[in-house]
């Protein structure tokens, strides 16, 4: 069984736990030290993913949002797991949340699965193969100018705190339409070609990004940190079709 097959099996295990919890709504909401929300469903979902990965690849490292790192610090192969990306949506009954499972080999994300069972959508890709949504090949858009672009932008205090609020707001005036779909979904919509640009909040962690990169790249879109570097360990991710990415970064860094 190859890496992608195992990641898809892990996503199946995650969906079984998370969707049941979302539907039953019997969880208690707790708060972490950083005030972010978490439930027992987050932890149980990460455990379900980890069990599949550990069984298939016992020598690999796993880095999860809820339980941290399992396995050797020097492992060439690392799985980055966000069991429920969009917990704030999950706890409020908003169906935009999903499990992120990304494989990093020698420091580069090569396989990614994003599963959003409440939306009935799953995206995946592995290096050298097309990106898929529910078994259908997807491609980024070919919109060639910012003034015709549809963008999803997470306009948050984090951008203002970084001194980039005015630059982000300027960008909103240069595109055709702006929405905030948030979290993983906006980047998957760029991979699908439904959106042209997606800009996340500042303050992300590697487990928020690792699974996204292979899918966005395999769909023919461009991705980077907010400075334009192909750095998935940065504090945010910016995605766009290849015609627009440089222009977006130019606006953000102006």
Predicted features along the sequence, with ranges:
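N-terminal subdomain of lithium-sensitive/metallo-dependent phosphomonoesterases centered on the IMPase/IPPase/PAP
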Residues: 1-84, 244, 249-250
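Residue-level signal for inorganic ion chemistry
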Residues: 14, 18, 42, 53, ...
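A structural micro-motif
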Residues: 27, 60, 129, 175-176, ...
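Short loop/edge segments at beta-strand edges and connector loops
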Residues: 64-66, 135, 182
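A structural micro-motif at secondary-structure boundaries
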Residues: 132-140
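An extended, acidic
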Residues: 140-254
């Amino acid at each position: 069984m190859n890496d992608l097959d195992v990641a898809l099996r892990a996503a199946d295990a995650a969906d079984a736990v998370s969707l049941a919890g979302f539907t039953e709504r019997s969880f208690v909401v707790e708060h972490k030290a950083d005030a972010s929300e978490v439930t027992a469903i987050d932890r149980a979902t990460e455990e379900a993913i980890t069990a599949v990965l550990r069984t298939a690849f016992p020598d690999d490292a796993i880095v999860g949002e809820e339980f941290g790192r399992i396995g050797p610090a020097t492992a060439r192969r690392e799985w980055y797991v966000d069991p429920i990306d969009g917990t704030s949506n999950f706890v409020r009954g908003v169906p935009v949340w999903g499990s992120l499972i990304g494989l990093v080999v020698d420091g580069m994300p090569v396989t990614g699965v994003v599963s959003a069972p409440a939306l009935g959508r799953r995206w995946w890709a592995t290096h050298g193969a097309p990106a898929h949504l529910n078994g259908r090949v997807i491609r980024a858009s070919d919109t060639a100018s910012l003034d015709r672009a549809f963008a999803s932008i997470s306009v948050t205090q984090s951008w203002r705190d970084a001194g980039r609020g005015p630059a982000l707001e300027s960008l909103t005036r240069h595109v055709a339409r702006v929405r905030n779909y948030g979290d993983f979904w906006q980047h998957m919509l760029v991979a699908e070609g439904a959106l042209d640009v997606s800009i996340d909040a500042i303050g992300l962690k590697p487990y928020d990004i690792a699974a996204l990169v292979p899918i966005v790249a395999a769909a023919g879109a461009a991705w980077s940190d907010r400075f334009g570097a192909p750095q998935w360990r940065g504090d945010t991710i910016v995605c766009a079709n290849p015609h627009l990415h440089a222009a977006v970064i130019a606006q953000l860094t102006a």
